[in-house]
From Swiss-Prot:
Gene3D superfamilies, per the entry: 1.20.89.20, Nitrogenase molybdenum iron protein domain, Proto-chlorophyllide reductase 57 kD subunit B
Assembly, per entry: Protochlorophyllide reductase is composed of three subunits; ChlL, ChlN and ChlB. Forms a heterotetramer of two ChlB and two ChlN subunits.
Species assigned in the record: Ginkgo biloba (Ginkgo)
UniProt protein name: Light-independent protochlorophyllide reductase subunit B
Keyword presence, 4Fe-4S: yes
A UniProt-annotated Pfam family: PCP_red
Amino acid sequence: MKLAHWMYAGPAHIGTLRVASSSKNVHAIMHAPLGHHYFNVMRSMLERERDFTPATASTVDRHVLARGSQEKVVDNVLRKDKEERPDLIILTPTCTSSILQEDLQNFADRASIISDSNVIFADVDHYRVNELQAADRTLEQVVRYYLDRSHRQETLDQSVTDAPSANLIGIFTLGFHNQHDCRELRRLLRDLDIEMNQVIPEGGSVEDLKNLPKAWLNLIPYREVGLMTAMYFEKEFGMPYISTIPMGAVDMAECIRQIQRYVNTLAHISSSKEVDYEPYIDGQTRFVSQAAWFSRSIDCQNLTGKETVVFGDATHAASITKIPAREMGIRVSYTGTYCENDAEWFKEQIQGFCDEILITDDHIKVGDMIARAEPSALFGTQMERHIGKRLDIPRGVISSPVHIQNFSLGYRPFLGYEGTNQIADPVYNTFALGMEDHLLDLFGGHDTKEIMTKSSSTDIGPIWNSESRLELSKIPRFARSKVERNTEQFARQKGIVNITVEVMYAAKEVLNA
């Protein structure tokens, strides 16, 4: 545990609540002190859904501390069972209430005997895993629970569907453009004549989980959630899974080719016809997706050699690193992820596509890295958006965590062939807006503003006088930030407090600003 005013991935119980609130007729009970109840408000605000968030807090108060939690927790489970009639109730503590070291598993077992609903305790180590890891573990636990129950009741049908079919695992609430990605992947599978067996956990019923083994394969669009479930199916049922991220034209083609290999392998067993998706890949790449054509246009060639920095979750950071570097000719000077548990896979994916790699969940290190790199554009999370604004660097948001403006009401997938178009737009426009700011500044547009000192730290820098600020304003905007930082660096090294025009020219000679 650590004290921080910003976290890229939240505490473990948030991941469990996200899985529970994604599923149909599932209720979560959170054993937590006051102050941990913000999930309901956060989800209602960001997802803009009409339904109430199915999560209830069993508050740890002074009475609980004096007498223990069992009576209160069991009463809350029974109350929600009577009021909501859910198929499943998931009981989870928070990192704070875990300090009490109470046997919540025993509470869940006792409640399940009395309740008409199934009750399980989220088996997550709240001190060792974050929000995304907990979501992955909780999803696998719920799936395993219902399949084991069906196996004991001898109601588990392991026969596969006649036509090729797939499960889509890992789409869930508060995900970055997850709803749009789900629609795009449904369309992709429909184009490939593959039936969608089930989507979990988003919109899925726990009573239908027993039908998951009927699919020919599992598709895992995100590394963060769904991988443990896919590995469980591979081990227990021999079901293949595809974890190649269908983002960008190149990886999109590779993902479809993997689907083709698995479908043709199973076609021999089920006496179905083999498939050939190469004409589909060619047609989509050349005529449907505009990104492939755009990457060869003169507009995109203007970005060749430009530098950028990418940071986000492992899935989006890896893909957004490869797309500009491989498909648009943009140099990625730094790329990184806050998913430290997936560092090995991340490094393997972006090998050769960037100059340096940063694996950290410390936003201060990320800010310092961005300040050193001085990129032409920045792609990251909401935090990198703030950092870019402070450093006057054009920026785009490509990964969670994000604020409400990135929960788009319009259709904006990042996966699939339509996703390639949606990615190309913000990548190009982020760079283009840098030139727009320059033109607005030259012609006295609405964007003229006082130049502020840019620094990734909170210390007070040297003071610019009116003459030096006037001289600085004459420098084009795209080079101004670099000149400003180099001059301030020179002033600090020389112990100069007030920056004059003479100091600016001295810094230029020494630092080649």
